[in-house]
Structure formats: C-alpha cells, structure tokens
Amino acid sequence: MTKNICPVCGYDELREPAYDEDGGGNFEYCDSCRFHFGYHDRGYGIEEPETHKIHQEWREKWIKDGMPWRDEDEKPFNWNPINQLRNIGIIISG
C-alpha cells in the first residue's frame, strides 16, 4: 500500500495524495502541520517553484513554532515529528 506523505512535514497518513495528476491540491488538511492543500497553495500546481517555496516557508514556521500537532487531543501516542520529517529528507537534531 502506498503511503500518502505530506510534502511539508512528512506525515505519512494523508487520506489521499496531496496533489492530483494535474497538480491540484486535494483540499485535505494535514493532521500534523495543518497545511491545507489546494488552499494555502492555491493557484499553483505541485511542480511550480512557488509551491515548493510555500511548503518550505510553512515547514520552517511549523518547526519554529515547536512542530505542534494540529489537534492536541488527537495527537497519536509516541508521535515523533523529527522522525516524521525524515520521510521528506529533512534531518534536524532533536
């Protein structure tokens, strides 16, 4: 089974791929970083440089804010955002 990974934070349990074949966002919120595909990146396809910049800026802010889970009451037991970021090749010390 293919995992649907958030390109912003590496969360690997998105319900659908973040973007469709044409590059449009799926309008899902990432449960981890709260990025809203198709809204926070509206007007850009997945391959657009602006989309990658938006992802990077959102990620940097999320990390700076302490990598909070979208809803603290629903945060998975043993969730580790530092390990999660490795899903997208981001290595940070923790």
Q: Residues of each region from the PLM?
A:
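C-terminal, charged low-complexity interaction regions
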Residues: 4, 13-14
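The −1 position to Zn-ligating cysteines in a subset of zinc-ribbon hairpins
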Residues: 5, 29-32
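Cys/His-coordinated zinc-binding microdomains
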Residues: 10, 34
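Short linker/helix segments within small regulatory modules
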Residues: 18-28
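N-terminal acidic leader/helix
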Residues: 31, 40-44
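Short, intrinsically disordered terminal segments enriched in charged and Pro/Gly residues
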Residues: 45-94
